Amino acid sequence: MIFLIFSFLLFFTAIVEKKIIFKISFFIILFFFCMTYGFGYDWINYRYAYYHSLDPGFIPFFAEPGYFYLMKVGLFSGLSFGVFSSIVTLFIYSSIYFFCIKLENRCLALFSLFSFLSIYILNEWIRQGLAVAFILFSLIQLNKGNKGGFITLVLIAGLFHISALVSLSYYYMHGTSYGKIKNKKGFIFLTIFVFIVLFSLYNPTLVNFIPIIGEKLFDYGSILEGAGVGFWEYVLTSKVVFAYFFMLCFIYLLYRQDKVDGSALLPMYMLFLSRLTQALIRIGYYFVPALVLSMDGRFIKERTGLKTSLNKLVYMTSVLMISCIPAWNDAIWYGSQTHLTIFSNSNEINIEISRKCKVINKYNEHHTIDTCRW
């Protein structure tokens, strides 16, 4: 899969850590993904919504207005869905570029962001990809001390995916020592929050009355109930949970070693908690930029090349392991083997949709791709 190939290549660029290598590798990835789309499945739903976005009375399958109005502008301008997707991808990767160039370890930052986000956020869950793009721009403003700009950009991100509002917690994290008492309250709050979500998922009828959020929890809970998999069975048998737990333990050991810098603990803890249930996976991804920022500070004085420290190599190997997670999911793995380009014609697109439907229907009976259920 192309995503794993790029992750492995970026792994080695992070060892070398040269500005020119960062630019070359970034623009190669940018060019490839701006020319292609259709790696997963969600694009099928989005493509249908795109070509019906100007129809009177048409209601999209998502509630947030940001992406829908972008669709309207794109279709009104006469853009094909492929070209529209290319422009959206360009914006998302531009946010990654401007975020990374503000850091000391640019190659490491690009490698980390791509490994955590590539297949899901940057290609499959495109609305959340746009939300993350605005979050990256908001962090640039926050680091400049422009708190108003930070809040404004987070609110704009919420127009594309409501879950982005969780990024307002960055305001709380910024400039604090994560090992102090104040941050211990953050750990307690996150633990209680996740416990409430888990309780709601396994008792969905209790929260169904809550607008939007309750309905989503009810839907996720119904899927869990239909699958017949209990919480502990899922946690103890999940390779994904193990991978995130391993990385959390490693970062905790780094914190114990440094005695001071524990800034990566909270975002990594949230990433781990988010993997305990499907309902929180999307929320967890918003903490990846905070983790990347923290690890950039941790390795700011580290040597590169053949003198790269063991700690940095272990961290990078852990991130590389995270990038392999899509390979553990048959639906994602086989669904991302083929793709389209912005030059694909209608016949090629229809063939690809048919191919995707065969895969998703085989591996996921609870999928939400409407075209594949007709």
Regions found by a protein language model. Give the residues of each.
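Alpha-helical transmembrane segments and terminal signal-anchor/GPI-anchor hydrophobic tails
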Residues: 39, 44-48, 53-55, 64, ...
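Signature aromatic-anchored transmembrane alpha helix within multi-pass, membrane-resident enzymes
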Residues: 189-191, 304-324
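Membrane-interface transmembrane helices that cradle and orient dolichyl/undecaprenyl
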Residues: 135-149
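Membrane-embedded helix bundles of polyisoprenyl
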Residues: 108-125, 129-135, 163
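Transmembrane-helix signature of polytopic, membrane-embedded enzymes
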Residues: 21-23, 97-116
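Membrane-embedded alpha-helical segments of multi-pass membrane proteins
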Residues: 1-9, 27-28, 87-91, 126-134, ...
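Membrane-interface alpha helices of multi-pass inner-membrane proteins
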Residues: 118-119, 149-173, 267-275
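Loop-to-helix entry region of an early transmembrane alpha helix in multi-pass inner-membrane enzymes
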Residues: 65, 77-94
